[in-house]
Amino acid sequence: MTSHLDDEGLHPMVSTLLGGGTLPTVPFKAYTRERMMELRTTKASMTRPENLSEDFNGEDGKFSPLKWLEHRWEIEGIKNRPMSKKIDSLCAGADENTGLSPQRRAFSSGCKAPTDDKGRDGEYERLGGHGKNWRNGSTGGADKFASRGNDFKPSFQKGNQLERGTRGAEWKKDTTRGAKFAPRREERLTSLSGSEKLPEWADGPTTMDDMIELRGFDEPKKVKNKKNPKEKKEKEAVKAPEPVECVGSRPSSTGLKTSEPIDDPAIAYSSSGGGALPATDQELAALLGCLDIQKTSRKIDGDDMAWAHKSEETAGGTSRLSRFFAKKNKSPELDAMLSSVGGGNDENVANPMLARLFGHSGGDNNASSSGAGDIKGGMRLEDLEKGMESKEPSKVSPLQDPSQQAQLLQHLQKFAKQQAESGQHIHHHRQPTPPNGGPQHQQHLHHPMVHPGMQIIADPSLLASFAQNPVILNAYVENQLQEAVNAAIRANNGQQLPPQLHEQLRMASMRNKAFLQSQTLTFVSLQQQHQNIQQHQQQQQHHQHKGRTPAMIPASVQRQLQKSSSNADQKKEKTSQSPPESNQETSDAHNQSDAMNQLKKLHMQQNYANMVQAMNSGVGWARGNGVVNGQQQHPQQQLPPNVQMLMAQHQQAQMQHLKMMMSRAQQQHMLMAKIAQMQQQQAQMANMQERQGPSHNQQQHQPVVPSELSQVGPIQTPLEKLLASVGVQGSQFTGSGDRIPSSVRPMSLEDLEKQLTAVPK
């Protein structure tokens, strides 16, 4: 029976367990990810089984298990929502028109809570039904639905104890009530009025495409370690290769040294391995032409070599540019360079480049200067602004190649040569030319105010301007310093100069300023001496050529001068006696007479000088006075043309003025004569009336002008004003009706003026 069971009724596994045997273990087989990826591309994996219907294909054309599962659920009558619908709804939520609910759920038909198929009864049964739920207290969760039927309370009903204090005591609602007692009545009123405040979680994006700000993902700020920059500098300095000096040799194309000597010491001492910057200050100064290394190297002793070795060792541990900012003693090379350039010995200037830039000559003293103010290749304002504004570093570091170093030296030498040529050119143009067009003598090579023997190196015109205004000297020195700095910057491809080179230029500028000051003082003293010598020579020449000057003026000349002065005094007296109306005209006449007197005096003095010269030189008076071949020349022919033209214009203006004065004087004399005649007639008529008596007052043989005008009275009529202006006194009138008698013939003002101004024939 047992065997029958084993063979027919029992499962082989059960029979094995009952038989006491062990279950056979299937060997565990695992695949790695790489192996699975390889199996994915095999032919068996790419072949679709025949039992998979094409009706369940997805959008990608492959079999979709979700569609097949949904089909099986529909057949079996399962109404649960399949997973495919959830995925489709998520995909549909990505539409642009789909909005977000306040709970961030997608909705297409408005903002509402999701419906439940089981309804409210299911919720009530879930909370415990009629039984008791110990989780929700003694009420079993029924207090949640207790207030649904009695939300509205009439006005006559009293509120419960929980709602007491809401009227007039709203300040207690947050403190007396707990967090779980919500002010339901206040919420209902605010919902009806539409002034409900949105909660915090309601603010945010309204669509799924809106961008939101993610916070809390910032990395913590790292605290800067003070030791890191120093350690970083030390590491960089250790990594930097030490420069290899190649003195007196030029690197070949194969990278090996050649024994060919270099003529230019700046290139020989500045070229280093890899084309880097010079390692020492001496090489940098030699590169820019500020130091003669061949001359300075002879002065270096054992201590200097030890210091140079020490500086090379320290340069490997720190930055190569730190030597410009380190606070230590000056190097012996720099001291030797300063002493050679600024020393007070009588040797030539050790730096001919700076001497040329600042106007020094190689064979003169340190303070010698050419004084050329204008440089032919000077820098314009636009170039200076471009040089100051260009702060971008060049792609190739400057002075890294011997050719660039030689180019820098060549630019500096060319600039110094141009400055020297421009100084000579300016000095040549400033030489005075002789007025008669004759050849220039040797004395014309110097300034006209400077003696030929004076030792003046600078331009005398500049020294004269410096003597007049010392501010020009300071401006001139600053301009030279700026031009030298700009030239060095241009030669250095626009790169900034090292501080030591800039200091060298400034010290050379100060020495140039001191030299120009001493030259200015020498120029002023020698100029005064030269002026005194010239005055003495002129006096001697005057005594030799013209003889002894007369001690007194001849009596004839004095009489003529006195006569002219007396005529002028007489004219002044006449003009002072004229009426006040012509004061302005007399002043003009006085000025004209003074001018004529001055011209007469000048002519007389010129004639007298010609006469004295003729007498001293033995020439007759006729030739000395301008008489040639029996004909006397006009004095104006001896004057320049412009003076003759001015004199002719002055004479014409004077003649016109004299004509006007004569016509006005004639008119005045005629007017005065007319008035005097009228006064005489009035006096005669008055005498006749007194003799004849009062019986003849009514006769009609009276003159045109009434006798009452002779009486003194107030001036009220235009006729009386006109008569008073010419010196006739008006008459007095006792009454307004007796002023003019009935026998007087009326006469207009125009007729009276015509009669007075009429010229008698």
Swiss-Prot record:
It is found in: Cytoplasm. Residues 101-274, 386-446, 557-592, 681-702, 730-761 are annotated as: Disordered. One of its GO terms (biological process) is negative regulation of translation. One of its GO terms (molecular function) is mRNA binding. Disruption phenotype: Defective spindle orientation, oogenesis defects and reduced embryo production with ectopic mei-1 localization. Derepression of zif-1 in oocytes. Hermaphrodites are sterile with gonads that are normal in size but display a bulbous shape in the distal region. When grown at 20 degrees Celsius, mutants display a mildly disorganized meiotic progression and contain a mixture of oocytes in diakinesis and pachytene stages in the proximal gonad. When grown at 25 degrees Celsius, 14% of mutants show a bifurcation of the gonad shortly after the transition zone. Residues 114-128, 164-189, 212-222 have a biased composition (Basic and acidic residues). InterPro entries: eIF4E-T. The keyword Electron transport does not apply. Interacts with cgh-1. Interacts with ife-1 and oma-1. PANTHER family: EUKARYOTIC TRANSLATION INITIATION FACTOR 4E TRANSPORTER. This is Translational repressor ifet-1. It comes from Caenorhabditis elegans. The gene is ifet-1.
